[in-house]
A protein has these predicted regions:
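Extended intrinsically disordered or low-complexity regions, especially N/C-terminal cytosolic tails and loops
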Residues: 1-200, 212-295
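Acidic/aromatic/glycine-rich contiguous surface patches that form carbohydrate-binding/processing clefts
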Residues: 208
Length: 295
């Protein structure tokens, strides 16, 4: 398979590429940590199969995670083809995967990676802008209570939760999304991340039967062509996933993961919101293709 192939990337192709281009000695492949050379080989294997992205950022993540964790996370974007092979959902890019790993690193369990790019270039600027807006609009209590000096998803989501319970509206998360979109010119990397926060808190509000406006795309006048480039964010699976995170938050679980303990909630929601079986793997990739078809 080469870059010009019309077929989606198969995970086995990438694994074979890495093994064939590195010497691992008698003990075979070292799954615990990839060195730089083997990380570069894995990246090259991905790119040879059509997944392009920013090399330096991808290498940093792959080096920190190791092959198994990286490929496990990448499988969230996979479906099973007619031959029973795991392949990427059409339209998936390496940048898309890396962006989600950097932003949603809590989904990777013990993953420990450098977030220097995220913290140094994203959080201080957003923290200052959002704090300024909050003070000017009598929301400073939300900011100070949660000590949001450096923005991240968990703190911002909790502040948004608090805002919803206080005033029964979506002013705080909606304005946060607007500020972020405006400051970064609706660029792909930041908008895709922070749109997730908007739907994350929106899912919580909807679960609590609050009458809120959760259609952020129209309010921010997001270009339609930009929305179309984020198929995995702008669909029902993403909203269901965020709703499950909200359910866990209400149950006192502050750090949620898409794990097997959420299975019943997932399938119950899928019964209410039928979607393509191909998308189900995004939430519960342990299910077989045959089981997924029942949705």
């Amino acid at each position: 398979m080469n870059k010009d192939s019309m077929s989606p990337m198969c995970f086995l192709d990438v694994e074979h590429y890495v093994v064939s281009h590195n010497e691992f000695g008698e003990n075979g492949f070292d799954n615990s940590k990839l060195d730089k050379a083997s990380s570069e080989s894995l990246l090259q294997g991905l790119k040879n199969n059509g997944l392009e992205g920013e090399d330096d950022r991808a290498l940093e993540v792959i080096l920190s995670m190791g092959k198994d964790k990286f490929m496990s996370y990448a499988k969230l974007y996979s479906i099973e083809n007619a031959l029973g092979e795991l392949v990427f959902i059409p339209g998936t890019t390496l940048d898309r995967i890396i962006d989600d790993i950097l932003f949603n690193n809590d989904l990777c369990g013990e993953l420990s990676i450098s977030l220097s790019f995220f913290r140094n270039n994203l959080e201080p600027k957003l923290g200052e802008s959002i704090s300024t807006w909050a003070e000017e609009n009598d929301w400073s209590g939300i900011i100070s209570e949660h000590s949001i000096n450096y923005m991240n998803r968990e703190k911002l989501a909790k502040a948004s939760f608090e805002a919803i319970w206080m005033d029964y509206d979506m002013t705080f998360p909606r304005e946060v999304a607007r500020i972020i979109a405006n400051e970064y010119g609706m660029d792909e990397y930041h908008f895709s991340q922070w749109l997730n926060i908007a739907s994350y808190v929106s899912g919580l509000a909807q679960f609590r039967n609050k009458l809120v406006d959760h259609v952020f795309l129209d309010e921010m006048e997001c270009p339609k062509n930009l929305v179309s480039r984020f198929p995995l964010w702008n669909n029902k699976v993403n909203m269901i996933g965020n709703l499950i995170l909200a359910l866990d938050y209400l149950n006192g679980v502050e750090e949620s993961h898409f794990d097997l303990s959420l299975e019943n909630k997932v399938w119950g929601l899928l019964d209410e919101y039928p979607i393509s079986p191909a998308r189900i793997g995004f939430i519960s990739n342990n299910k077989t293709n045959q089981e997924a078809k029942r949705a």
